[in-house]
Amino acid sequence: MTTKSLSELLEELTPKRVVEELNKYVVGQEEAKKAVAIALRNRWRRQKLPENLRNEVIPKNILMIGPTGVGKTEIARRLANLIKAPFVKVEATKYTEIGYVGRDVESMVRELVEVSFQMVKQEKMKEVRERARRLAEERLLDYLVPHQFTSFGIRESRDAGKREELRQKLRKGELDDRIVEIEVKEKTVPMVGIAGPPGLEELENQIKEMLSGLIPSKRRRKVKVKEALQILEQEEAEKLIDMEEVAREAIYRAENFGIIFIDEIDKIAVKTPGAGPGVSREGVQRDLLPILEGTTVNTKYGPVKTDHILFIGAGAFHMAKPSDLIPELQGRFPIRVELKPLTKEDFKRILVEPENALTKQYIELLKTENVYLEFTDDAIEEIARIAEEINTKTENIGARRLHTVMEKLLEDISFNAPEMAGQTIIIDAKFVKAKLENLVKDEELSRYIL
């Protein structure tokens, strides 16, 4: 996808349309959906401004407040998928203040650029796939039918018939399991990540590049023909792509369309500044400030400006309040939205409405074994009631509770499915109660199982 088509896609995605798309996957939380839809539209509006004014318009970062499992991450991830934007999710607690052992906050920007680079690279590889396939086919045939030369160094033509015969077999898949020895490019040496002072990740990348030059660039491998074709196609596609152009496009996308989702931001909020572990947490907040305000981060693909990256902070804020963040950081998240805890009615909708609804997933999974599930309305009601009850009695983990409830409910059917081929199983309220009622009553047991 080119920058132009990305801009065109943004133009089509009006705030209403964005909310409609998000509704396909996330139930409720209208306020949060509206906030991200407006933030997305403002990106397109900014692209339309004169350049001198464009640089003045900075994205309004969003702070999502709400318990776990209510859709914070899903809203941000679906938004990024909608516009094919680079997206990374990081946890605020994984970072340490500059000068301490651990990851420095700039690494989140480097991760974003890496994601952006891989996205652009895959798009470019799709464009050259047909040509790469033809070139890979020729290389593979060279291995299967080595060229014969005359004493004068002229290639003999008699191998042409054999070559064409093998080409047809190759395309039909008749040679897939045959073993062939090919010469492949050696991958970069894997290195174990080391926790250390800031900048070490960048140094690690440079060392990898140096070592890759010292190690033989090619080696011979024996693989099946099917795998050989894939390896050679990948190599040929990479040769056809201008990696410098990919890097430039990746940086542009990361700078102008990138989204960084900072989860558990409430865990670095400090109630009593200047004491105990709060000192380090406050340090992480201060290290985040320049990135949120706009700075330049050096990456292996080139310098990246963070001025127009959209940051979405998220946290439950049970133990702390947004006002416990340092004032400067609070100011960097001008848009605040509160996500509501999920109710039984929400659970009922989550089970059936989204395109990736859990009931639909289980129906399709078991259909592969020729086992047909049917969920009645009273079963959906009962599953939702049980999920809400367990969330109330134990830890409230939101919609994630439905996964554990459904897994336990269908455990026996999933286990015995191969022997149940051709059967249709009706899941009704009676079935749900029989499987789960005792577990729900036993609070201690439900803590461990559900």
Swiss-Prot record:
Annotated binding of ATP, by residue: 27, 69-74, 263, 328, 400
Alphabetical keyword list: ATP-binding, Chaperone, Cytoplasm, Nucleotide-binding
Upper lineage: Bacteria, Pseudomonadati, Aquificota, Aquificia, Aquificales
Annotated GO MF terms: ATP binding; ATP hydrolysis activity; peptidase activity; proteasome-activating activity
Gene3D superfamilies assigned to the protein according to its UniProt record, in alphabetical order: 1.10.8.60, DNA helicase RuvA subunit, C-terminal domain, P-loop containing nucleotide triphosphate hydrolases
Name this polypeptide is given: ATP-dependent protease ATPase subunit HslU
Residue spans crossing the bilayer: none
Function: ATPase subunit of a proteasome-like degradation complex; this subunit has chaperone activity. The binding of ATP and its subsequent hydrolysis by HslU are essential for unfolding of protein substrates subsequently hydrolyzed by HslV. HslU recognizes the N-terminal part of its protein substrates and unfolds these before they are guided to HslV for hydrolysis.
Subunit structure: A double ring-shaped homohexamer of HslV is capped on each side by a ring-shaped HslU homohexamer. The assembly of the HslU/HslV complex is dependent on binding of ATP.
Top-rank taxon, per record: Bacteria
Recorded name of the encoding gene: hslU
